[in-house]
Amino acid sequence: MNTLVNILFIMIPLLFSVAYLVYFERKVIGAIQLRHGPSVVGPFGLLQPFADAIKLLVKEPIIPFRANTILFIMAPMLTFILALIVWAVIPFGAEVITENGQQIVIPKVIANVNIGVLYVLAISSLGIYGIIVAGWSSNSNYAFLGSIRSAAQMISYEVSMGLIVATVVITTGTLNLGEMVATKHSMPFWIDLLMMPIGVVFFISLLAETNRHPFDLPEAEAELVSGYNVEYSSMPFALFFLGEYANMILGSAMMTIFFLGGWYPPLKLSLLYKIPGLIWFVLKIVLLLFIFVWTRATIPRYRYDQLMRLGWKVFLPISVLWVILISGVLLFTGNLPGRGL
């Protein structure tokens, strides 16, 4: 029963967050482009997400004549479900208890598993199947080309992201996300500074992994009309849409855990520790989401060859170099996990 309550406690706010992330994005881009953004439905346009949801609910779901109906319907469901189940291992805070004179950190999470990092990477990589199936089952050249682009893009950047995550694991000595945050909090400050450049690479890779601007080539309007979801309408289209924005929030949460200290305040000041850890965690995610939106409004789209070159010829060598550099520095200074940290 407690597990069910915890799931609802996370899923309901997450779904509302996804809905209002769309509103937040439209408002921010409107302000950057000197427009009002949503302002008609409800005060300040706050009811716009509900109006959009009702519109999509009452529209007729159209299935192309030559489409594979079962796979066509399952693809958006797969994408959306995978975007949600990853949150089972994401910690939102921690409770510190003292046992036998030692402080033990207990993360506030649905499933406190010791391989949380591997779980996140595994489930995230499965998201590509929903996109590939959507493009193939639509029997549309535009949709299929968009899905192929998305597959190549996500696979290319997952290599760099995996190496960057390996760097974080080497630094902390654990695959448990809650323990990772607690370990990083107790590390010397210079290690965090050394990790910041690779954190920037990780965030840019997130933009490509989530098919966000300036790497939204799978749905480049000028070339592919709308990409892999061009044949979708009504709620199947909405599920793709919700899955994309849920992955944005998930990526921001992972960036927060790996590089921004999780639920701990940015500075080790006693006054800042009076603010609940959940608030710090949410504030950091909101800041990263703002950068997601800001990037969309200000940076032009990359060409496909530029995207591939950036992933394989720039980010991959940097990631490999940083794994070697971090390992060597930690070993030389005696800060490897289990060697005096």
From Swiss-Prot:
The keyword Transmembrane helix applies. It holds the Pfam family NADHdh. One of its GO terms (cellular component) is plasma membrane. The chain crosses the membrane at residues 38-58, 70-90, 115-135, 161-181, 187-207, 239-259, 275-295, 314-334. Disulfide bonds: none annotated. It catalyses: a quinone + NADH + 5 H(+)(in) = a quinol + NAD(+) + 4 H(+)(out). Signal peptide: none annotated. It comes from the Bacteria. Keywords: Cell membrane, Membrane, NAD, Quinone, Translocase, Transmembrane, Transmembrane helix, Ubiquinone. One of its GO terms (molecular function) is NADH dehydrogenase activity. Its EC number is 7.1.1.-. It is a multi-pass membrane protein. It is found in: Cell membrane. One of its GO terms (biological process) is aerobic respiration. NDH-1 is composed of 14 different subunits. Subunits NuoA, H, J, K, L, M, N constitute the membrane sector of the complex. NDH-1 shuttles electrons from NADH, via FMN and iron-sulfur (Fe-S) centers, to quinones in the respiratory chain. The immediate electron acceptor for the enzyme in this species is believed to be ubiquinone. Couples the redox reaction to proton translocation (for every two electrons transferred, four hydrogen ions are translocated across the cytoplasmic membrane), and thus conserves the redox energy in a proton gradient. This subunit may bind ubiquinone. Belongs to the complex I subunit 1 family. This is NADH-quinone oxidoreductase subunit H.
